Amino acid sequence: MARNLVCGRWQLLRLLRPQRSYHSVAVSLRPLAAELLAARRGNGRPPCALLAVFTPRCISTSATLFAEAQVQAPPVIPATSIPAAVPEVASGGAADVVQCATEPSFTELGLGSYTPVGLIQNLLEYIHVDLGLPWWGAIATCTVLARCLVFPLIVKGQREAAKIHNHMPEMQKFSARIREAKLAGDQAEFYKATIEMTRYQKKHDIKLLRPLILPLTQAPVFISFFIALREMANLPVPSLQTGGLWWFQDLTVSDPIYVLPLVVTATMWCVLELGAETGVQSNDLQFMRNIIRVMPLVVLPVTIHFPSAVFMYWLSSNVFSLCQVACLRIPAVRTVLKIPQRVVHDPDKLPPREGFLKSFKKGWKNAEIAQQLREREQRMQKHLDLAARGPLRQTFTHNPLLQHDPSHPPKAPNSNNSSIKANAKKPWQDTLG
């Protein structure tokens, strides 16, 4: 049995022995399992469990030497080209892209919300970052969008202003009657002229304050833009410091040479003089013309140190208003928008124009007369209240407190004396003064 086992092992080693004197990775085409099965059958012995352990000799010498060379050889570092130096300042649109990528968002800066001011800031950020416009272009674009939203209200104000202009001669006649009644103290004529003027306005659907109330809806828009831009300038937003134009590159500070405040004041005077917002030109109403001409000069010292971003919005709004009034003067545009054509009145039928000082003095005098009339009405009402609450007070033809000589008693008034009647004052003047 031992002999058979040794023969079986010898045949197994013969099969596993390589066929060449040198090591190779080539193998026999006959499967190893088939040769083992044939050897077992040739012996005619029961199968024996054999454990074949492959030694390192089974590995190719060339493969071993190659692995040792890979371990011992130093790693080869591929040669790389030295990157070119990147310029510090990019030109053109690349600088804007780099700046937009590095600057913090408005949310990180504490700006932007769902309030009117925050919505304007979000819109400005979207136009600047997503659309790629510089800050001065973003402010101008946002201003045009806001003005387009309130354009229907401006058209309605233009309709009312044209209606007032066409009925201006009749309205001025009523105003003259009311003013003369005030100066004369004629209450009956005053109330009569006032009632007639009210009926005339109701008949033709004229509201003097309607053209002024409608543009006041722009006040919340202006205030929201002002607060939004002032917050952005006071923070400041980093990119806003280089987002200007020409000589005002920094939009967070005021104009160093004060050109923007002067240009904005001039354009605002043109807008008010031409009635671009209300549709009522300054030569229609005297008191409005005086106020309009003084307003820009009064506002200038207050606004001269505003940030340039605020002046950029203001200038864009004024330029839009001037273009708007030029467009609304085209007859075809007025017909499409249903704005009545302005009637050219005869200058002879209109009251003569007065200078600023003369009209100011006249207005001051009218205000004093109106105050005197109010005081007189108050005194009359006071005496009527006293008469209603108590008995009538006794009146005398002379001062009863003065001591008279017994030989010369005070004379009673003679009803037949015409001179006394002529010099006698009216009873309400003796009482009211």
From Swiss-Prot:
Cell compartment(s), UniProt: Mitochondrion inner membrane
InterPro entries xref list: YidC/ALB3/OXA1/COX18, YidC/Oxa/ALB_C
Record-stated family: Belongs to the OXA1/ALB3/YidC family.
Subunit-structure text: Monomer; predominantly monomeric at low salt concentrations. Homooligomer; predominantly homooligomeric at high salt concentrations. Associates with the mitochondrial ribosome. Associates preferentially as a dimer with the large ribosomal subunit 39S of the mitochondrial ribosome. Interacts with OXA1L; promoting cotranslational quality control in mitochondria.
Cellular component, GO annotation: mitochondrial inner membrane; mitochondrial membrane; mitochondrion; protein-containing complex
The keyword Transit peptide belongs to this UniProt entry's keyword annotation: yes
Lineage: Eukaryota, Metazoa, Chordata, Craniata, Vertebrata
The protein's name in its UniProt record: Mitochondrial inner membrane protein OXA1L
GO BP annotation list: aerobic respiration; mitochondrial protein quality control; mitochondrial proton-transporting ATP synthase complex assembly; mitochondrial respiratory chain complex I assembly; protein insertion into mitochondrial inner membrane from matrix; protein tetramerization
PANTHER family per UniProt: MITOCHONDRIAL INNER MEMBRANE PROTEIN OXA1L, OXA1
Biased composition annotated in UniProt, kind: Low complexity: 413-426
Membrane topology: Multi-pass membrane protein
Record PTM Phosphothreonine, positions in chain: 395, 397
Keyword Transferase included in the entry's annotation: no
